[in-house]
């Protein structure tokens, strides 16, 4: 919290710097006119009391001075100066509730307050709102949004100082403009007005498309919608990952989070290699464009489950060979699954641990007779007797599909077991011939 307030104080000093000149001029005019009470709605004594408060350097003492002034002159025309002094003092005292209270009182004076002063106190109000606890932010969300919009309007009305070029003035207004839009976005978020938050965050991105935090926050807003807008959420998370302003640690952290969200969106059972491929494709797209292409999409867990419902190894072969979007969706659904009793013709057997069988997938006698080239390799684990499988024999195995090559078409299986009935029985060891004893020679007797 102390770090936040230190930053608030620095930013507020910058904001108030734009209005100090005009306020000083107005005070000077007030002092000159204050000597003639028929021309000014306050007395010189009243003016001097306000000036004494303005000169006070200790915030708590200044607040006491201002309290005494307001108690004595509750309807003073000098409140247009007194209320902003409260704002500055309470900011130094790290009291956001009072900053907000007196900023609102200043703005409530309407056109009596010049645009520069209104901008300054509304800027301070926005910074103070950011330091409130969540419950207080939620309670004050509607007023915070109104104040942010009023701040943008006041900032637009601030006249360029004579000593600044148009470009320099435009640059000075950029940070306050972003702050007001950010306040609008956060207030909309806590009020569960997610479309409103999207609008405010996008206003920031229109000024700074590469901003890490804004892209990330916008992704979170899309994810919080009902139903979640997953493609937009993924897109803006990816924009945050690829932000040129992100450190390596920040980029890695958001990338890890994005990957986990994609995996969850697809049911958590998609092969890691496929999730990595989808992530890399998304990052490449997001790194080259601020806006998500309407054609960009990822299959959901529901899409994948629908494919798996009626999927067989035969349909997997057909769909993968066909290529295109159907092939991609089928592979997402099939990769990592265990398929039972896959039929095939053994083309080659490589003993070892694991045993590797090269098999041609067949579904008919005609295909079996014609098969001479394998289109699958099958790693058999924990079944040493499978080494007895003979070349050109028919087998069935149950295994996990782990990879495939589109050209030439080839499937890769792991953790497989061959159907016991398809493994030839172990040949019995040949029996030893019986030992023949030599016939006893007849006795000579």
Residue locations for each model-derived region?
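N-terminal leader/linker segments that initiate helical-solenoid repeat arrays
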Residues: 25-83
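Structural motif corresponding to the intra-repeat A-B loop/turn of tetratricopeptide repeats
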Residues: 56, 93, 132-134, 138, ...
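Short solvent-exposed coil/turn linkers within tandem alpha-helical repeat scaffolds
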Residues: 72-80, 108-118, 135, 155-176, ...
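Residue-level recognition of tetratricopeptide repeat
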Residues: 88, 123-129, 186, 220-221
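TPR/TPR-like (Sel1-like) alpha-helical repeat modules
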Residues: 140-154, 223, 227-249, 259, ...
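Pro/Ala/Gly-rich low-complexity, hydrophilic intrinsically disordered segments
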Residues: 152-159, 257-258, 264-332, 417-445
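OB-fold single-stranded nucleic acid-binding module
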Residues: 307-310, 314, 328, 347-441
């Amino acid at each position: 919290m102390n770090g936040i307030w230190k930053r608030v104080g620095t930013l507020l000093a910058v904001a108030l710097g734009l209005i100090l000149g005009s306020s000083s001029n107005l005070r000077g005019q007030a002092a000159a006119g204050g000597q003639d009470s028929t021309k000014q709605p306050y007395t010189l004594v009243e003016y001097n009391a306000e000036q004494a408060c303005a000169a006070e350097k200790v915030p708590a003492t200044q607040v006491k001075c201002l309290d005494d002034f307001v108690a004595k002159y509750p309807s003073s025309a000098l409140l247009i100066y007194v209320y902003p002094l409260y704002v500055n003092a309470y900011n130094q005292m790290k009291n956001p509730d009072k900053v907000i209270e007196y900023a609102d009182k200043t703005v409530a004076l309407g056109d009596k307050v010049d645009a520069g002063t209104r901008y300054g106190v509304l800027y301070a109000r926005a910074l103070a709102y950011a330091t409130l606890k969540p419950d207080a932010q939620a309670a004050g969300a509607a007023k915070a949004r109104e104040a942010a919009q009023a701040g943008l309007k006041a900032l637009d009305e601030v006249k360029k100082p004579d000593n600044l070029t148009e470009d320099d003035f435009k640059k000075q207004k950029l940070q306050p403009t972003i702050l007001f839009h950010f306040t609008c976005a956060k207030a909309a978020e806590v009020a569960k007005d997610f479309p409103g938050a999207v609008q405010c965050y996008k206003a920031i991105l229109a000024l700074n498309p590469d901003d890490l935090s804004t892209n990330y926050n916008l992704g979170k807003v899309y994810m919080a919608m009902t139903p979640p807008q997953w493609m937009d959420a993924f897109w803006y998370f990816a924009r945050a990952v690829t932000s040129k302003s992100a450190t390596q640690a920040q980029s890695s952290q958001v990338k890890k989070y994005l990957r986990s969200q994609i995996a969850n969106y697809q049911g958590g059972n998609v092969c890691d290699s496929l999730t990595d491929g989808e992530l890399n494709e998304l990052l490449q797209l997001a790194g080259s464009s601020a806006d998500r292409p309407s054609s960009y999409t990822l299959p959901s867990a529901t899409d994948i489950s629908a494919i798996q419902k009626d999927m067989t190894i035969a349909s997997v072969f057909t769909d993968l060979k066909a290529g295109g979007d159907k092939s991609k969706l089928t592979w997402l659904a099939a990769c990592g699954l265990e398929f039972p009793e896959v039929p095939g013709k053994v083309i080659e057997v490589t003993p070892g641990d694991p045993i590797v069988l090269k098999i041609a997938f067949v579904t008919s006698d005609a295909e079996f007779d014609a098969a001479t080239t394998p289109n699958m390799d099958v790693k058999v684990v924990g079944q040493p007797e499978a080494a007895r499988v003979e070349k050109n024999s028919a087998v069935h195995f149950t295994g996990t599909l782990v990879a495939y090559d589109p050209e030439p078409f080839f499937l890769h299986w792991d953790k497989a077991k061959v159907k016991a009935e398809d493994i030839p029985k172990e040949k019995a060891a040949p029996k030893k011939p019986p030992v023949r004893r030599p016939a006893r020679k007849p006795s000579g007797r």
